[in-house]
């Protein structure tokens, strides 16, 4: 068994915090294992002057790290699972999903402010079509503005007055020790999260049995079932950065509850929930996707 690994990751503060969590878990599971970290700049990190949906939706924060794995520079990659495309290349696999953190979206605004109490016409920043669609449905009076950059940059823009509020993933804020800036946690019946939100996705080369064996102790069955259902939902719809799609799976005993939404940019959307056995999460995800497509989602996707 090898005694060293190199992790590839983006260079943002959040990406490094998540990478160090995986590094520490690996070293706890395998005393004596040396784990190095290589920072890699992705296309999504470079292009900051355009909305994500205007750049493209196939692995904006992933492709360059996968290339480093193919070249043998790194052995595995640590991602926010919500950044992964709906289908991975055949030579890559989602090797590990550790225990999920808070999957909810978070509103960051003036202290005490909630989504319902934001003033008429308030400027709300988000880079997500999924969030924008659901916010338009809830509060059509809001002025939704694109928001790019890392978490620190987004919070700085809010402090400077460029926005009245912004919406970010709660998990990222909590991992960065910034929970105190959250003014409201948005429950899934208000905003359905992104597929994989709150999960760290560890990607490795398919067939790299030695690396996969080292990673195996880090996998969490509940997180694995949830992301399998959510990604099956996303894959059936064909969604990416260009389509407002959200899903959240919750494990209750042997049953998996899956919430999903398909939307349009103007705030029209279809939402639904389906339950099924946790032993077939992919089947549950595909079934809910079919249900929502038939209920009007297909027409929304067609424009």
Curated annotation (Swiss-Prot):
GO terms for cellular component: cytoplasm. Transmembrane segments: none annotated. Pathway: Porphyrin-containing compound metabolism; protoporphyrin-IX biosynthesis; coproporphyrinogen-III from 5-aminolevulinate: step 2/4; Porphyrin-containing compound metabolism; chlorophyll biosynthesis. This is Porphobilinogen deaminase. The gene is hemC. It comes from the Bacteria. InterPro entries: HemC, Porphobilin_deaminase_cofac_BS, Porphobilin_deaminase_N, Porphobilinogen_deaminase_C, Porphobilinogen_deaminase_C_sf. The keyword Isomerase does not apply. GO terms for molecular function: hydroxymethylbilane synthase activity. The lineage of its organism: Bacteria, Bacillati, Chloroflexota, Chloroflexia, Chloroflexales. Binds 1 dipyrromethane group covalently. It comes from Roseiflexus castenholzii (strain DSM 13941 / HLO8). Monomer. The modification S-(dipyrrolylmethanemethyl)cysteine is found at residue 241. Belongs to the HMBS family.
């Amino acid at each position: 068994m090898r005694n060293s690994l190199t992790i590839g990751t983006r260079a943002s503060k959040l990406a490094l915090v998540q990478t160090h969590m995986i590094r520490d878990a690996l070293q706890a599971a395998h005393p004596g294992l040396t784990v190095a970290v290589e920072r890699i700049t992705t296309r999504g990190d470079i292009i900051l002057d355009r909305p994500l949906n205007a750049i493209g939706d196939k692995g904006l924060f992933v492709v360059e790290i996968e290339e480093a794995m193919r070249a043998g520079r790194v052995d595995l990659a640590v991602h926010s699972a919500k950044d992964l495309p709906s289908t991975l290349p055949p030579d890559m696999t989602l090797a590990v999903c550790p225990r999920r953190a808070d999957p909810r979206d978070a509103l960051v605004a003036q202290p005490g402010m909630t989504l319902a109490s934001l003033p008429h016409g308030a400027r709300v920043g988000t880079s997500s079509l999924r969030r924008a669609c659901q916010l338009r449905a809830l509060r059509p009076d809001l002025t939704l503005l694109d928001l790019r950059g890392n978490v620190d940059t987004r919070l700085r823009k809010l402090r400077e007055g460029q926005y009245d509020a912004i919406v970010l993933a709660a998990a990222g804020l909590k991992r960065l020790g910034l929970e105190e800036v959250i003014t409201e946690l948005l429950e899934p019946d208000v905003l359905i999260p992104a597929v994989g939100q709150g999960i760290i996705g560890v990607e490795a080369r398919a067939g790299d049995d030695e690396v996969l064996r080292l990673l195996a102790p880090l996998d969490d069955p509940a997180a694995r079932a949830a992301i399998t259902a959510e990604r099956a939902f996303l894959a059936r719809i064909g969604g990416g950065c260009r389509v407002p799609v959200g899903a959240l799976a919750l494990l209750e005993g042997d049953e998996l509850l899956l919430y999903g939404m398909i939307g349009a940019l103007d705030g029209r959307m279809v939402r639904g929930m389906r339950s099924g056995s946790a032993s077939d999460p992919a089947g549950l995800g595909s079934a809910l996707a079919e249900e929502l497509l038939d209920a009007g989602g297909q027409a929304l996707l067609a424009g």
